[in-house]
Amino acid sequence: MRKLLLIALCFTPLFSHAEGLPDLGDISQEVISPQQERQIGEQSMYQIRADKSYLDDAEIADYLNLLGGSLVSNSSEPGQAFEFFAINDNAINAFAMPGGFIGVNTGLILTSQSESELASVLSHEIAHVTQHHLARMISGQKFDSLASMALIAAAILSARSNPDAAMAAIVGVQAGGIQRQINFTRLHEQEADRIGLGILQKSGFDTRAMPTFFERLQKSSRLLEGNTPTYLRTHPVTNERIADIANRVQQLPYHPVASSLDFQLVRAKLQTLQKTPQEAIVYFNGALGTQKFGNPVAQRYGLVIALLQSRQLARAAQEFAPLRKQVQSNAMIATLAGQLRRAGAISDPNISDFFQTAAQNFPQHRALMYDYSEVLLQQKRYSDAVALLNQQVADHPNDPHLYELQARTYAVLG
């Protein structure tokens, strides 16, 4: 995890103050081309995917990329390739890397009280990428200065609770030229706020969510007495920044937006990952019993996942029945229905027909396709499995699990 934090800090602003925004120009691409930025990001992602904290969950990744993709389409660079991914870490943080790679901690997703709040953070990170902030930070320096940036990140990590100590460590690492970097990065956060807010509005989300989320984090940091959320250490939020965002929001038309069901389901699924199955069962039973907070559909969804994990199959099927009646068409719930069938919680002699119909309804839902492929392999329908997996690999060329399933299928065929 230490290595992962170093990578994150290398590509996020170090300090921030609410200042005016001079025209920084487009000097960044004179130093690092978009192709080089992508290469740097790819190399970093290679290390991140190998880290145990990388959350390899297709449903959560697909949700983040669907949400992030809708935001990118309303950015200044809608054609740029982006990849959004989750880090299994309770710390409230998100970070952008060059080339369009954006990581979000599970703690931040669970802390977001609405989809608009999560979208506001993603919009902010998208702005860091589209504005080429990393390239601006090292403009005028040699390309190999990235090595010293890693040392700077290490200094910040070791003194993250003491900004003054961090500044002293940074200057000790690279006295010449670092002050100019800091002067530029002081502007990046406010620029990302302004541009991110525009992305949020164009994408149809509640713009009030941005100042609301930042203000809540700031208040929580005061209550924690020094145990500042990680997001505030890598993206310092000042009263001036919050006031500036709030002032901009007040000039925009009010547009309340309900959170999607998928947002609620993802949060429920993350709760099951943060707890033991028994703890999750107690948690969701309590939530459903009080019926005061959260989405009851999502709470029941989380309960069924926990029951399935604990092999309480009969009760899992019992709890799933009303869920299926409440929601007629949803990829995540259809995937859970398939998992209950595969586990034997729901007896279905026509299980392949169920998966065929579900796959037709949700052809891009990778988790569903994983299970459908397994069913086809179990039924020795190898040609059907090959056809399905070849199409999925074409649609998702960076998914190693699909390649694994494809290789298993070809191995059986000889």
Language-model segments: what does each one mean?
Residues 4-5, 9, 13-95, 177, ...:
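Hydrophobic or amphipathic, alpha-helical segments that drive membrane association/targeting
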Residues 24-31, 42, 54, 62, ...:
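Extracytoplasmic and endomembrane cell-envelope/extracellular-matrix remodeling and assembly machinery
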Residues 44, 122-134, 195:
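Active-site His/Glu-centered metal-binding helix of metallohydrolases
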Residues 60, 80, 138-147, 164-169, ...:
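Acidic/histidine metal-binding catalytic segments
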Residues 106-120:
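Short pre-active-site segment immediately N-terminal to the catalytic Zn-binding motif
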Residues 116, 126-143, 161:
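Catalytic Zn2+-binding segment of zinc metalloproteases
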Residues 146-164, 168-180:
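Membrane-active amphipathic alpha-helices enriched in small hydrophobic residues
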